A protein has these predicted regions:
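Conserved glycine-rich cofactor-binding loop
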Residues: 17-18
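C-terminal helical subdomain
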Residues: 176-180, 195-243, 247
Length: 251
């Protein structure tokens, strides 16, 4: 596959098949970007690309060859949104599942590294590049039974913040967005499709929705080139920290 003519600024969004990624792709398309929607689920991103006038690129961020192929298909990149990620399991360290930990590390940390490294030359060449990495408040806090996810998100955040210094003087801005509770497929994936456990995460609160985070990404992308928003934390009003909520109904 080769990329189409790209007269507009190009935004690459990973994890674009659902949730924050899909909403971000739609938001950036409305702002005039040609969006390259990247994810593993081909049918979803192909439908999305048709609807927004973008390009669908089927790729797994944990696969070196797939990421290299992604980079080869793009002649220009102005914005990269590192959104692919997720959690698996909720267990104490003593009962940690190493396969879950490996998956979280590969997807959240090495996936971000692969894509960023592959597209960085094009972002620099754009003359006004932007890298947005969607981490989590789990990149800033810890909570019981969540060490696998918080460790991966801390590492992802450290990667992004380190790059901020390494690119000082280059024409690339970097913004980390750390959401709290967002009602997407996140909890369903974490609990291996257990609808009841996933629903309980949001019980008694009004969580964020994907569009709330996407609007923040759009705001960041619309700032003048001299303005760098280093870190944005976005939580529901009902949430004070990763483990502290005000739940209606007494839960």
């Amino acid at each position: 596959m080769t990329s189409p003519e790209q007269p507009h600024r190009v935004a690459v969004v990973t994890g674009a098949s659902s949730g924050i990624g899909e909403a971000t792709a739609r938001t950036l398309a409305r702002q005039g970007f040609h969006v390259a929607a990247v994810a593993r689920r081909a049918e979803r991103i192909q439908t999305l690309a048709r609807e927004i006038g973008g390009t669908a690129i089927v790729a797994d961020v944990t696969d070196d060859a797939a990421v290299d192929a992604l980079a080869a298909q793009l002649s220009r990149v102005d914005v990269l949104v590192n959104n692919a990620g997720g959690a698996r399991g909720l267990a104490p360290v003593a009962d940690a599942d190493l396969e879950d930990w490996r998956w979280m590390w590969e997807t959240n940390v090495l996936g971000t590294l692969r894509v960023t490294r592959a597209l960085l030359p094009k972002l620099v060449d754009s003359g006004d590049g932007l890298i947005v990495t969607v981490t989590s408040i789990a990149a800033l806090e810890t909570y019981d039974n969540g060490a696998g996810y918080t460790a991966a998100k801390h590492a992802q955040g450290a990667l992004h913040r380190t790059l901020r210094g390494e690119l000082l003087g280059k024409p690339v801005r970097l913004t980390e967005i750390a959401p709290g509770a967002v009602q997407t497929e996140f909890s369903l994936v974490r609990f291996d499709g257990d609808q009841k456990r996933a629903a309980a995460v949001y019980e008694g609160i009004t969580p964020l929705v994907a569009e709330d985070v996407a609007e923040v990404v759009g705001f960041v992308a619309s700032r003048p080139s001299h303005v760098n928003l280093d870190l944005i934390v976005i939580r529901p009003r009902d949430q004070a920290s990763a483990s502290r909520f005000s739940r209606r109904g007494g839960r």
